[in-house]
């Protein structure tokens, strides 16, 4: 069975984590994240609540990866985007 290389990334406002991992062909998004070691390094990553993607497109943990893919772990939103837009619009009126 051949191998694939993928990147796993997790970005915080103050720091970015980028891990290159080599996996067996047919590996999943979840397997790449586990192999990257980011779950142990960052206790705030919870795969049950954090969304993931491949090159900015939403993905599921079971999705199969291709060679050269970039797996992204997204942080939860801290504010509702609709509420923020409403607040900016009100502020602009003043």
UniProtKB/Swiss-Prot annotation:
Name the Pfam families for this protein: Ub-RnfH (PF03658)
Question: Where, if anywhere, are coiled coils annotated?
Answer: none
Give the matching PANTHER family.
UPF0125 PROTEIN RATB
Q: Which family does it belong to?
A: Belongs to the UPF0125 (RnfH) family.
Note the NCBIfam families from the entry. PRK01777.1
* Protein name, UniProt field: Protein RnfH
Q: Which organism is it from?
A: Serratia proteamaculans (strain 568)
